[in-house]
Amino acid sequence: MAHRFPALTQEQKKELSEIAQSIVANGKGILAADESVGTMGNRLQRIKVENTEENRRQFREILFSVDSSINQSIGGVILFHETLYQKDSQGKLFRNILKEKGIVVGIKLDQGGAPLAGTNKETTIQGLDGLSERCAQYKKDGVDFGKWRAVLRIADQCPSSLAIQENANALARYASICQQNGLVPIVEPEVIPDGDHDLEHCQYVTEKVLAAAYKALNDHHVYLEGTLLKPNMVTAGHACTKKYTPEQVAMATVTALHRTVPAAVPGICFLSGGMSEEDATLNLNAINLCPLPKPWKLSFSYGRALQASALAAWGGKAANKEATQEAFMKRAVANHQAAKGQYVHTGSSGAASTQSLFTACYTY
């Protein structure tokens, strides 16, 4: 016989629900600016810019100081610990700049992968130790949501039942701890696109992973109305020779979600998974036009697919600030339109927006 002990007060539930809904309201999505120092270094290296704290700060200042109308397209920004405490050139905290624009501030909470012994190089995610204390401090510092990324891959004997269950339980425990501290948890069980599997195989695995995640969330008494999901779109592996249309990706993706994600979840914000900027937008638009029931807001939580053109336009030069902001705003508006099924591809995208952003075994 199951016994129920209240996990959250009505006031806590109300706050969490309102935060989650505000992030995805009216076609808004999320900018994932939570790249680690090492990952940001890889991005800067491609444009021949040194990976220093000042260069990282300068690029993010350009993004965050964009015109306030960005709040019509971006509802939340995920920050890395370093960025949460950085300031602009006038001494103003980035988090306060975002809040003044009406954008909700989030934080990356997982601490990377650890090997699962007895599996084919599978991992579970670290970061549960001390998580409650970190969440409490971040809440005091103005953070209202968190993000935790679990990584699963399709390969020989992968993902194993052990990896699926272990990562689902870690996600659920993280989500529960977040909510206890007033943070909306973004649940990110990512089936990465490495491999040569086809669309149907990815759909099958994605359904198994999401079903396990929501079983675990239920077991851990997580309040679904105060959460957001950040899944992969259902796509073929990067090395698959068969190509699929955005409409085929959309049908497989929405079918998988319809079978596994409760309607209580207010929003699903897709990761871009190394797609080009333009492909990520076209697929999101097709998903919102898919003729299947869609009880959730279907939006975006993009990092590379919102920043690639902006980074290329910047090139490490302060004189390129306006061009950088224009490139960022263009992608943000395009994805805002796609989140409402209203994006029209004009064919005038720059080279950076059509270049694949895939990185094998990608880590933040």
Swiss-Prot record:
Q: Name one GO cellular component term.
A: centriolar satellite
Keyword check for Nucleotide-binding, yes or no: no
Task: Quote the gene name from the UniProt entry.
Answer: ALDOB
Which coarse location class applies to the principal site listed for this UniProt protein?
cytoplasm
User: Which organism encodes this protein?
Assistant: Pongo abelii (Sumatran orangutan)
GO MF, one example: fructose-1-phosphate aldolase activity
Per the record, residues carrying N-acetylalanine are: 2
Sorted UniProt keywords: Acetylation, Cytoplasm, Cytoskeleton, Glycolysis, Lyase, Phosphoprotein, Schiff base
This entry's Enzyme Commission designation comes to: 4.1.2.13
Q: Which Pfam families does the record cross-reference, listed alphabetically?
A: Glycolytic
Q: What is this protein called?
A: Fructose-bisphosphate aldolase B
